[in-house]
Amino acid sequence: MTNMRKSHPLIKIINHSFIDLPTPSNISAWWNFGSLLGVCSALQIITGLFLAMHYTADTTTAFSSVTHICRDVNYGWLIRYAHANGASMFFIFLYFHIGRGIYYGSYSFMETWNVGIILLFAVMATAFMGYVLPWGQMSFWGATVITNLLSAIPYIGPTLVEWIWGGFSVDKATLTRFFAFHFIXPFIIMALVVIHLLFLHETGSNNPSGLNSNSDKIPFHPYYTIKDILGLLLMLLALLSLTLFSPDLLGDPDNYXXANPLNTPPHIKPEWYFLFAYAILRSIPNKLGGVLALVFSIFILTLLPALHTSKQRSMTFRPLSQCLLWLLVANLIILTWIGGQPVEPPFISIGQLASVSYFCIILILMPTTSLMENKLLKW
């Protein structure tokens, strides 16, 4: 009698995806982030579901319903802060996951990479809508500023913005629809994750050397399940430390004041994980130009396979490219810092320099450095 794990139509799929999956024997901890993102999204859906049981998507009661969750619901404060800080963890892992993909040339798997970029856009949109729901000052003004960017689209812009708002300003209709979209989007994300994994398992995982590893594969279970569990425990340690010791560390104090359309906060800024893109948006004085730069700052990831000029896939044996990648990371940290600063000198010029260098590193320096490395190796 054959093993049920290998014969049952449903269990067989799980077996081929997580148990008997042939995996390169040398993948490092950088390959842990995929599974951590899966766990993160599951946690977000569970905590979000419990929050939705008590939350009311109405401008008059939204803010007080969040207060009610924190004060009166059993462990409501824990659910709320686990959800808010879980989003931060999600983005940290997302950026690590993308960074690993760039470093080791994982973007060569075109379908997996492109579905991943669609996932990134979907997660960013979902997180943005979630930030609006508590209906604090930064929620309201963040929603107003970011949705207003669409008015820069020629001809249809202003109509489009009013259509999204459901009126002439961010109001009850906007909050209700944002809650509906914020609720449905994680399930759409989960469907995209399945497609992402489907494409990945067509080719198999990449590995740190960037070489074909077909001759050296090991089963996913128990080797990588135990490794993933270690990553999971470390993630839970970080998340619980953040949630229990400093839950408001990554939040904005302005969001503890209820939304007031008549009072603009001195510095409107999004959550920390969007600050790099926000800095790029602000560094261009033209509205449409800023919006295009903002979109292109993420969309540029789709060009990476076309910009890959090296004859090696991974950066493991390419020290010059490694230096450039770490320069890019430093640049993104600077952009994140600038995004949280007021629009005044010297921050304006630092932001403009960092924005220009961001695009220069990816579009010009990285491809030319790769060509130079090819020459150094006489290839």
Swiss-Prot record:
Heme b b566 binds at residues 97, 196. Binds 2 heme b groups non-covalently. Heme b b562 binds at residues 83, 182. GO terms for cellular component: mitochondrial inner membrane; respiratory chain complex III. It is a multi-pass membrane protein. The keyword Calcium does not apply. It comes from the Eukaryota. One of its GO terms (molecular function) is ubiquinol-cytochrome-c reductase activity. Its main location: mitochondrion. GO terms for biological process: mitochondrial electron transport, ubiquinol to cytochrome c. The chain crosses the membrane at residues 33-53, 77-98, 113-133, 178-198, 226-246, 288-308, 320-340, 347-367. A ubiquinone binds at residue 201. It is found in: Mitochondrion inner membrane. CDD domains: cytochrome_b_C, Cytochrome_b_N. Keywords: Electron transport, Heme, Iron, Membrane, Metal-binding, Mitochondrion, Mitochondrion inner membrane, Respiratory chain, Transmembrane, Transmembrane helix, Transport, Ubiquinone. Belongs to the cytochrome b family. The cytochrome bc1 complex contains 11 subunits: 3 respiratory subunits (MT-CYB, CYC1 and UQCRFS1), 2 core proteins (UQCRC1 and UQCRC2) and 6 low-molecular weight proteins (UQCRH/QCR6, UQCRB/QCR7, UQCRQ/QCR8, UQCR10/QCR9, UQCR11/QCR10 and a cleavage product of UQCRFS1). This cytochrome bc1 complex then forms a dimer. Component of the ubiquinol-cytochrome c reductase complex (complex III or cytochrome b-c1 complex) that is part of the mitochondrial respiratory chain. The b-c1 complex mediates electron transfer from ubiquinol to cytochrome c. Contributes to the generation of a proton gradient across the mitochondrial membrane that is then used for ATP synthesis. This is Cytochrome b. The gene is MT-CYB.
